[in-house]
Amino acid sequence: MTFATVYIKPHTPRGDWLASLGQYVGLEIKTVDYKSAEASKFEELFPLKRVPALVTPNGFQLTELIAIVEYIVAKGSKPELSGKTTEERATNTRWLSFFNSDFVQAAGGYFMGPNDEIKQQSLQTMLSLLEYIDKHLSQSKYFTNNTILTADIFAFQIFAMAKQFGVDFTHYPNVERFTGEVSQHPIIKNM
């Protein structure tokens, strides 16, 4: 039985991994392109038209990526995927938020900015963030601890998208190591 339907924009880091996340924690998540014919109720259910957006068979609705990820993990069989301790869970949420806001904003400005000036400013911001991230990963195997958590999976998704847009990670060896290791996680491999 389907645990939830999640409306997504396909081929984006915020949505592509949610079905695989659900599978990993023992839940069947159906993802639907929010612009498809199958999504006829999307606008009625979610008038702000923002994705991802989750709805369960009993009508529970949830928006915002971090809330959706935490809900799926908490309802699944592997709650430790968000961290085992209060500190790990808080740190994991911190990194999810960092990537979902700071990094996505800079990357989006670089990839889709309306003019060259904004694209260059966004690129400089993204490169500064990559330096910060690389330094952090020089002291920690993953973002929160030595276990892959949801923030690591989401970060991998964002880095993969950045590579598709031509971002060169060769100056960030710890980011390259990180992406190589996380690419082997079942959530990524089952996408």
Curated annotation (Swiss-Prot):
Known Pfam families for this protein? Answer: GST_C (PF00043), GST_N (PF02798)
Q: Does the keyword Zinc apply?
A: no
Q: What reaction gets catalysed by this protein?
A: RX + glutathione = an S-substituted glutathione + a halide anion + H(+)
What upregulates or represses it? Answer: By O-dinitrobenzene.
GST N-terminal domain ranges (all copies): 2-80
Q: Which GO molecular function annotation, any one, does this entry have?
A: glutathione transferase activity
Its GO biological process annotations read: translational elongation
Query: Sorted alphabetically, which keywords does the UniProt record give?
Result: Transferase
Please name the InterPro entries in this protein's record.
Answer: EF-GSTs, Glutathione-S-Trfase_C-like, Glutathione-S-Trfase_C_sf, Glutathione_S-Trfase, Glutathione_S-Trfase_N, GST_C, Thioredoxin-like_sf
Q: GO cellular-component terms in the record? A: cytoplasm; nucleus
Coiled-coil regions listed in the entry: none
Annotated ranges, domain GST C-terminal: 85-191
**Function as written in the Swiss-Prot or TrEMBL entry:** Conjugation of reduced glutathione to a wide number of exogenous and endogenous hydrophobic electrophiles.
Per the similarity annotation, which family is this?
Belongs to the GST superfamily.
Q: Which protein are we looking at?
A: Glutathione S-transferase Y-2
Organism of this sequence: Pichia kudriavzevii
Encoding gene per record: GSTY2
